[in-house]
């Protein structure tokens, strides 16, 4: 009798252990899928989550970004957000670029301008050819061109 009871406990513990391990494996595989960098672009080149632009302005700017990107063979991306979700502007911009599959060619060439309204912060991230094409002086020039428009709330002019 004791032996049967002991065997049942062992069987129950083994069953619980198998269930626990299975649940953990499912959780970890789902988390791993979230951090996979996709091969192709997942979103448009304009992502206006802060809703700074009208629909017409979005269409106009997205067409312009597509034209420049195809001509230069480097993704040119503009992203606006309300919150950085606890990240620095640089980390958010880098992650957004990578985990949304931006970039053209084997070196994933491109540039992304991120504007965060809540943090009143911005960042420009470059990859591939974008790193070589846009120097620190170029980044300074770009920021000098768009920051006054951004400060005045002229968002379309800032992004063009």
Predicted regions and their residues:
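Bacterial N-terminal signal peptides
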Residues: 14-25
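Folded, non-transmembrane soluble domains that reside on the lumenal/extracytoplasmic side of membranes
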Residues: 11, 26-160
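Bacterial N-terminal signal peptides that target proteins for export
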Residues: 2-15
């Amino acid at each position: 009798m004791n032996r049967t009871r002991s065997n049942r406990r062992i069987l129950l513990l083994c069953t619980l252990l198998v269930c626990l391990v299975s649940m953990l494996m499912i959780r970890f595989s789902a988390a791993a899928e979230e951090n996979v960098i996709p091969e192709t672009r997942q979103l448009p080149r304009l992502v206006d989550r802060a809703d700074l632009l009208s629909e017409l302005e979005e269409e106009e700017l997205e067409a312009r970004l597509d034209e420049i990107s195809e001509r230069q063979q480097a993704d040119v991306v503009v992203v606006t957000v309300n919150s950085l979700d606890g990240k620095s502007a640089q980390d958010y911009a880098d992650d957004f670029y990578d985990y949304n599959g931006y970039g053209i060619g084997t070196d994933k060439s491109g540039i992304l301008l991120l504007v965060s309204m809540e943090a009143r912060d911005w960042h420009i991230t470059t990859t591939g050819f974008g790193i070589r094409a846009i120097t620190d002086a170029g980044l300074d020039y770009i920021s000098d061109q768009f920051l006054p428009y951004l400060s005045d709330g002229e968002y379309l002019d800032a992004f063009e």
